[in-house]
A protein has these predicted regions:
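A short, highly charged nucleic-acid-interacting micro-segment common to nuclease
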Residues: 116-132
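Active-site metal-binding core of divalent-cation-utilizing nuclease and nuclease-like domains
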Residues: 85, 124, 138-158
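Sequence-pattern detector for short linear motifs
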Residues: 73-75, 134, 155
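Nuclease-adjacent, charged terminal/linker segments that flank catalytic cores
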Residues: 1-119
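Short gly/ser-rich loop at a beta-strand->alpha-helix junction or flexible surface loop bordering the NTP-binding
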Residues: 131-134, 139
Length: 158
């Protein structure tokens, strides 16, 4: 915990990021940050399905505004752990991991490799990457997949 706070303070000083108010980083937040790091980016809908979906049946209606997901992502953005980028083909934002979020993951030893987070989405592969993220979410939710190795990890181990 001390290491994490020290890393956050150091990155805030170096990047001049201001944090509105303190908050507790939960295990779900760390998992969410790791997911965004591994998948390069995530949409609000994808984060809802992966981390916040409490519907008893998959056929039940999805909440219209995904309010809880939206609130938590806003907290992580204010803390400087996530940033948003507009996708003009969908008129929706996607979320990317910031350098501060990456430092938090490194300090918690949550990563299999240590490549810097993606700074810009390559829109040539946007649809492909988004669909892979949905496939991963579906496989993990159905418990058919327990450990996911992203393509970036596999390429770094060659």
């Amino acid at each position: 915990m001390e290491i994490e706070n020290a890393v956050i303070e150091e990155v805030k000083k170096s990047s001049r990021v201001s944090v509105a108010k303190p908050f507790r980083l939960t295990e779900r937040d760390v998992s969410l940050l790791r997911f965004v790091y591994e998948q390069k980016f995530a949409t609000l809908e994808l984060l809802y399905f992966r981390f916040f979906d409490k519907r008893p049946n998959a056929s039940d209606a999805v909440p219209e505004n995904m309010w809880v997901t939206r609130q938590r992502v806003a907290v992580l953005k204010r803390a400087g752990l996530l940033r948003s980028q507009m996708v003009y083909t969908e008129s929706k934002a996607i979320y990317l991991l910031t350098q501060l979020g990456y430092q938090v993951l490194k300090s918690k030893r949550e990563l299999f490799h240590y490549a810097d987070p993606v700074q810009q989405v390559d829109f040539r592969y946007f649809e492909h990457d988004k669909r892979i993220s949905y496939c991963r979410t579906a496989l993990e939710r159905s418990e058919k997949c327990y450990l996911w190795f992203p393509e970036r990890t596999l390429r770094m181990q060659r």
